[in-house]
Amino acid sequence: MEQEINSVKARLEEAMAEYGKEDICLAFSGGVDSSLLLKAASDAVGKTGKKVYAVTFDSRLHPSCDLAIAARVAKELGGIHKVVSVDELEQEEIRFNPVNRCYLCKKKLFQSLKDFAGEMNIRYIMDGTNEDDLHVYRPGIKALRELEIISPLAELHITKAQVKEIAAGYGISVASRPSSPCMATRLPYHTEIDYEVLERIGKGEEYISSLIKGNVRLRLHKDIVRIEVDRESMEELLERSGEIISQLKELGFTYITMDLEGFRSGSMDVGLDMEA
């Protein structure tokens, strides 16, 4: 296993050494995937005198804590942190949360990133898509391909588990940080996205995460909120249900439930035609 990880790490370093001959623009969330890329890119440009810009989207469709985390981690890893503000809901089609919302959002976000890179005369624009992302419902990947965004982790067939292991080996502070996807994934498709509702959901998730380790999602179905946590955290969720219910009621949620299937990425995609 160690030999395999060392081989994967070497392939990543070799690829980034080539890209590092020029300035690099990286979509940077502060999550483990983009942080590993930033580490590899920073090491590469450190040998060539070029620069790597770690660009974070300031978007209300993403948890507010992400911006502060991204700024801190970018500084730790040697990237030049930049922020690009985007309001996805300016686009009416996105606001009504269609099944291809992820595609539309990615197209809008990464067009903004391309505009930034163009102003800086940067040719290499990257994101942290990994191998595993290619095998689940990720309509946003189509937008990345259309915009010719480079995804080194996916191109090198590096899986999420390998990303985490390599990041931990580098001592990256967010190596075990749970993923933090777009807040629109908390609502059913064809439900109008409302920033006030997403803010309440975000506060609820933040509160539960302060009590329970691991993944936490609040999925809202009209007046029912469905709590997803890792299966090993279910017992603790039940033990602390009184205070959690009280807090969620204060946030305006009516019916509060625990999903017995536990946390699973993309649970709102159940029943979709993935080939559509």
Each predicted region: which residue ranges?
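ATP-dependent adenylation/nucleotidyltransferase module used to activate substrates
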Residues: 1-169, 225, 243-253, 258, ...
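AMP-forming adenylation/ATP pyrophosphatase catalytic core
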Residues: 138-276
